[in-house]
Amino acid sequence: MERKIRVLVAKPGLDGHDRGARVVAAALRDAGMEVIYTGLHQTPEMIARTAVQEDVDVVGLSIHSGAHMTLFPDVKKLLDENGMSDVLLTGGGVIPDDDIEQLQKMGVGRLFTPGASSEEFVNYIREQVEKKWAQAKTG
């Protein structure tokens, strides 16, 4: 039996709005994924530590504070430093298109903005992780 996709949903920084993160976490659970939700006010170090401890396949950041150009690169760097460069870093929030393009050039996966459907992010995560697992099997 193939294991469930493990997703860490995190709310970095001082943003106190977590309704979107909770909706995402519920949709991923409903799709059969194992979800670890960090709660509010996480530092990049806390997120990376939890990702390592939980051995996740995906880290999803929910950012509505405008600090995405700092938080995504900081988490990416810490994941890489902890041997988790193969973990998909994705997320969403109110992020301008130009910033999305820059973040993706830094190695961040697809980013979802308000209005994205749960089907979109569930399918994206499933496709990316299953592709990684298939590549690992073929070596």
Predicted regions and their residues:
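Short, flexible coil/linker segments at domain boundaries that flank nucleotide/cofactor-interacting
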Residues: M1-K4, M84
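N-terminal pre-triad scaffold of radical SAM enzymes
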Residues: A10-L14
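Cofactor-cradling patches in redox/metallo enzymes
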Residues: A21-N123, E130-K131
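The C-terminal output helix
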Residues: E127-G139
